[in-house]
């Protein structure tokens, strides 16, 4: 909710109201507290730290489609399961493709996300994907505010080398 509020404040638009009802067995249901008929609905939801966030997003998408939203745009700052982007050994799932299929089946019209583990994940979707990079936000600050002669940028794996290369 915090990020959604910051985005709305920055854009000067109101944050829509939702209700999430929790049940004793751990299930939950979502509903919109206002009409979204004919509206473009942006759903801001990370898939981290657990799968409940993903399920909540899927239910929000479904509810928006059933409420006759004009379009449903999923804004996922952290796309979980993205490291599962290929079959690197026998008998493994491709989690990123499965999540893409689930989001598409639920009814998203577009995805906005940041710093995917691998660019190929964009191809898993049958809707437009806006893949944003945090490095574009931070590079100017790093270049102008930090002593570059002693700066080292590290990455947790090879797939993220493009980020550290961008600082050169």
Q: Which sequence ranges carry the predicted segments?
A:
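Active-site loop-to-helix "anion-binding N-cap" substructures in soluble metabolic enzymes
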Residues: 1-2, 6-158
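Conserved small/polar residues in nucleotide/adenosyl-binding loops
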Residues: 162-168
């Amino acid at each position: 909710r915090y990020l959604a509020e910051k985005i709305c404040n920055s854009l000067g638009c109101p944050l829509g109201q939702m209700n999430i009802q929790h049940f004793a067995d751990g299930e939950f249901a979502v509903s919109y507290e206002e009409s979204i008929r004919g509206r473009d609905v942006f759903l801001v939801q990370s898939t981290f730290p657990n799968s409940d966030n993903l399920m909540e997003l899927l239910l929000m998408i479904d509810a928006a489609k059933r409420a006759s939203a004009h379009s449903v745009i999923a804004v996922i700052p952290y796309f979980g399961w993205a490291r599962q982007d290929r079959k690197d050994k026998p008998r493994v799932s491709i989690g990123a493709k499965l999540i893409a299929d689930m989001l598409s089946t639920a009814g998203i019209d577009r995805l906005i996300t940041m710093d995917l583990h691998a660019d190929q994940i964009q191809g898993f979707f049958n809707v437009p994907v806006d893949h944003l990079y945090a490095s574009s936000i931070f590079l100017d600050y790093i270049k102008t505010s930090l002593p570059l002669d002693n700066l080292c940028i590290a990455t947790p794996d090879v797939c993220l080398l493009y980020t550290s290369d961008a600082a050169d």
